[in-house]
Amino acid sequence: MVLSRVPQHKPRVDGEQMFAILSHPACRPERKEQEKKGRLVSTPFSPSIPPSMTPRPLILHLDIDAFFASVEQLRNPRLAGQPVAVGSGVIASCSYEAREHGLKAGMPLGQALRKCPPLVIVRGHESIYRCYATRMFEICHNWSPLVEEHLDEAYCDLTGTERIYPDPAKEIARLRAQIHSTTGLTVTAGLGRNRMFARLIGKFHKPDGLGYLEPEQEEALLLRLPVENLPGVGPRTVEILANLGIEKVEQLRELSRSALAGLLGRNGEALYERCRGEDHRPIGGREIPRSIQRGTSFDEDVSCPRTLDAMIEYLAERAARNLRQRGLEAGGISLQIAHSDHRRDRRRIVLSPPTALDPSIIRAALALRRSMEGRRTAIRFVGIQLDRIRLAA
């Protein structure tokens, strides 16, 4: 394994850098996007990956560390080094200082404040976050022939670039340094033979690191992972598999393709390949999914309607953001709630016209929640599913 970890730096105000970012076309008012400053710190040189060890195809995954919270710390230097959470009702992102207190995305703010009384809560500024991400994407496009953009992450296809980049780790170190000097943000990089491995490898080197595994090491990593680390495995799938005594990828491999398909439908067939290290999703593809799901199991059963509504809003925003990132819209929405007595309620309504807008999707999700009122048992799980997905008009 090759690993580079960069020391954490304190953000610094830099007038020239702030002006450069705010002057960028993507940040002009007519684009409804703004951007602020960054920090200038050199990034140490990453160890090299010998060309002979470089897998082909080669996929790079870049993930901005604690994105929303990091931007807020850059915008307000007084927040540097402080536990910061971004969100309203539920944490959408939190700084690494907050994570040291056990905080995480999806946690109700009331619970977060009990765990970390000095927590600073900031409402989100999505247009500013998009502007920071745009700068990172532009750097990636100048460096890679094929880039797939998401809000806080990017996939770069480096297949066939060995002549241009004979030492991938050295070039990735330069790329990360450029992103850092331009935006003030740190990114974690994972390098693998497909997008699944690239993301998984990077996950184990957060924050501000570079991870790479040789092909034979990828297999060893995959087998010992919990199933929830695989793409497409959400809380409901984890629960279904746990009822069968399946918690690790190694156990999941014991199921046949037909068994998984019968258990999980089309997602089961994809899972059969993923648990064997296969991921054929192309970088930059415009595949239209049948549905988009977001859900969470509460650490503590919830009986407060306001806490439940805050979580539903958070999940609806995440699902809607996923639609917009992919140029899609949804024509239907379902809400599923699991109670502490194991009873499940599920209801669905049509979204007319189809939409990808936060207010419309949140309003529909909350209407579904109100239609389920009547039971007095606490809530253990809540999930949202968007369906009838199509390309945005």
Regions found by a protein language model. Name each.
Residues 8-9, 17, 24, 34:
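Low-complexity, intrinsically disordered or signal/transmembrane-proximal segments
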Residues 149-153, 192-195, 328-332, 377-381:
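Short Gly/Ser/Thr- and Asp/Glu-enriched loop/turn motifs at secondary-structure junctions
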Residues 186-188, 334, 381-383:
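Residues at or immediately flanking beta-strands
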Residues 12-14, 30-39, 49:
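Intrinsically disordered, glycine-rich low-complexity segments
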Residues 61, 229, 237-379, 390-392:
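DNA-contacting surface of Y-family translesion DNA polymerases
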